[in-house]
């Protein structure tokens, strides 16, 4: 059954059902620039999932990892796997963060909101400087202000947050800027460092990925030779994706992203075991490369999520150790590099904007005094060997939050919220509510 209605001017709602779920969709206007009352308006989209027996339960907002990825699309109570556990105590809001999904997505040929950029109907038509300026409005600070408008629209004083990866960064910004609106804060693999020293964070992640690479080669010794064959092909311009697109050495190195996932070693082993001339290999390689045209925000302003009052200046490239630079079998993880924007035809449109954004002076995201004063209960899953968000930085930041309880575990990789089924969320809800000690 579907019912539709209008909740206020320019705001739309629709309610429908899935087996075991009641689904309400909400769309409302939000300013592109929250500091400008005359700013162009984006559309903000969210789906609210409820157990049919619990349509009055408090809200839990899921903040997706990324940046640049939309919220999951549920097809039932177990999709994603943790949803059923959340619905026992909450209604769950799946928020498409601005620029993703149905929230005025960023793309070269997507129609821009009226008045967003003078003289341009799409970002492809805009100058690189205009593209860059537009994209400065898609960080966690703006996402939090969007969420606050949604909260006010729904008429609730407080709600709880569940932040996965970059969603945890956004949750921390929420506690810094609007802690009074937060009932409970849950983090999974997503507590960032504070301050401008991005290079040290990336240096740590490079060292971690080098160690993961060596562990993989030790477990599957033949894989290193297969990787060297691929490196030789890449250097010769003979490594290609299904459409004929060339893959260079640095882009190839990013298949190391697999090593930060559950069963990632096995996935990498299977990929390297394929005949490099086969269609299967070309397609699977394309699927394993982390940065691409589907979610351009993830590539173009990725490093800005770590920028707490600094310029990024290609921090991951600058922090790459010499030993890694000299050995292409030491793989990369979530490390953006310039060649992405020349090799990938879908990212070429963003190349000049990416250079400009790398020199943009990003404002601070976090206020340490506000975090120390945040009287909000919470719990965090900190993964001991997290490939993307180093544990030591997460723990230092967590120590600022007076009511946050941390659970350090080596049982899961960065995506433990999903791979654990209901396990990680169940643990955090109990920890935050005082139903367990650790």
Segments and roles (model prediction):
Residues 8-242, 348, 365, 369-370, ...:
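Gly/Pro-rich cap/lid or specificity-loop segments adjacent to the active site
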């Amino acid at each position: 059954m579907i019912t539709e209605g209008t909740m206020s001017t320019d705001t739309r709602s629709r309610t429908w059902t899935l087996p075991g779920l009641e689904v309400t969709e909400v769309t409302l206007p939000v300013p592109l620039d929250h500091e400008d009352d005359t700013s162009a308006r984006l559309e903000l989209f969210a789906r609210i999932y409820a157990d049919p027996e619990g349509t009055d339960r408090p809200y839990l907002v899921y903040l997706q990892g990324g940046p640049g990825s939309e919220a999951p699309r549920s097809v039932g109570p177990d999709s994603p796997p943790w949803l059923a556990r959340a619905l026992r105590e909450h209604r769950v809001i799946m928020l498409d963060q601005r620029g993703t999904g149905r929230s005025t997505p960023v793309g070269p040929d997507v129609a821009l909101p009226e008045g967003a950029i003078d003289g341009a109907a799409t970002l492809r038509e805009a100058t690189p400087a205009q593209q860059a300026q537009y994209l400065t409005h898609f960080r966690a600070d703006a996402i939090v202000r969007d969420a606050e408008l949604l909260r006010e629209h729904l008429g609730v004083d407080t709600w709880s947050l569940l932040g996965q990866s970059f969603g945890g960064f956004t949750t921390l910004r929420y506690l810094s800027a609007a802690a009074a609106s937060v009932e409970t804060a849950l983090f999974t693999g997503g507590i960032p460092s504070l301050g401008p020293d991005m290079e040290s964070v990336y240096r740590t992640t490079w060292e971690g990925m080098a160690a993961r690479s060596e562990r993989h080669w030790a477990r599957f010794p033949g894989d290193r030779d297969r990787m060297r064959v691929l490196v030789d092909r890449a250097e010769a311009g003979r490594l290609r994706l299904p459409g004929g697109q060339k893959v260079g050495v640095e882009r190839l190195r990013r298949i190391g992203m697999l090593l930060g996932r559950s069963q990632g070693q096995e996935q990498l082993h299977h990929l390297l075991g394929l005949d490099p001339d086969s269609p299967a290999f070309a397609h699977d390689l394309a699927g394993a490369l982390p940065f691409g045209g589907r979610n351009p925000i993830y590539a173009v302003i990725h490093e800005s999520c770590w920028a707490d009052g600094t310029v990024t200046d290609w921090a991951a490239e600058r922090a790459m150790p010499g030993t890694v630079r000299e050995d292409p079998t030491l793989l990369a993880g979530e490390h953006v590099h310039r060649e992405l924007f020349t090799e990938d035809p879908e990212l070429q449109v963003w190349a000049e904007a990416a250079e400009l954004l790398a020199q943009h002076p990003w404002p601070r995201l976090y206020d340490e005094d506000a975090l120390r004063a945040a009287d909000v209960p919470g719990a965090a899953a900190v993964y001991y060997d997290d490939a993307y968000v180093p544990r030591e930085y997460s723990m230092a930041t967590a120590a600022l939050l007076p009511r946050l309880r941390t659970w350090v575990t080596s049982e899961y990789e960065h995506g433990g919220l999903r791979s654990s089924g209901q396990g990680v969320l169940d643990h955090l809800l109990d920890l935050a509510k005082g139903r367990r000690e650790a």
